[in-house]
Amino acid sequence: MDFYSQIGQDRIVLKYLKNKKNGTFVDVGCGFPKHINNTYLLENQFDWTGVSVDLIMYSEQDGSTWNDCRNTKLIVKDALTVDYLTLFKDNNLPVNIDYLSMDLEPPDLSLECLFKIPFDEYQFSIITFEVDKNREGDEKRINQSREFLTSKGYVLIGSLCSGQDDVYLHNSLTWLTNEFQFVDEEIIWTKR
């Protein structure tokens, strides 16, 4: 199977959700429709549906656009101006969404956007959240995201690529952490 995400986010989601078919996702800061995209594989090989948000509609190197590669909706808009509660309702997303991917540049924007997600109305099974710990001023921002997600019922289970992304499971699913410890040549996965 070909994986498409940059640092293994799609692998982690499939591993923990046991290759789930017909799941749902929200991909904020999705980037390209296929290349280094965290949800392309989920949609195209596992029949997931969802909604993605990015400031720009990127094209692949071959010139293909989102509409050429994907069936799910792309909202081309500044992620910080999106009303996520309305977006989720208008797109008939279930209250229990399988995957939330947050990957905005710079990472400060990911944190600001995280606070806009309606966690009191929606629950996510797994979240990958870009913290990019090697950037200046990262410790405070990382601690804020971790404290916030913990307060919303999520458990930090590890990081990808030495702190590029934090990975969370909803506390109702933490029994899954006993089943897997993910390490391979391409992805550095550290269980916390």
What positions do the PLM features span?
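A short acidic, often aromatic-flanked loop/helix-cap motif at beta-alpha or helix-coil junctions
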Residues: 79-84, 163-167
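Conserved acidic-Pro-Pro-aromatic motif
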Residues: 40-41, 45-49, 95-102, 106-192
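Short amphipathic alpha-helix with an adjacent loop that forms part of the alpha/beta core around
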Residues: 17, 84-94, 114-120
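A broad, low-specificity signal for short, low-complexity segments enriched in glycine/proline
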Residues: 11-13, 87-91, 128
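Short, surface-exposed connector motifs at secondary-structure boundaries
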Residues: 22-24, 93-97
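SAM cofactor-binding core of SAM-dependent methyltransferases
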Residues: 2-83
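Hydrophobic packing residues within well-ordered alpha-helices of enzyme cores
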Residues: 13, 61-63, 88, 111-114
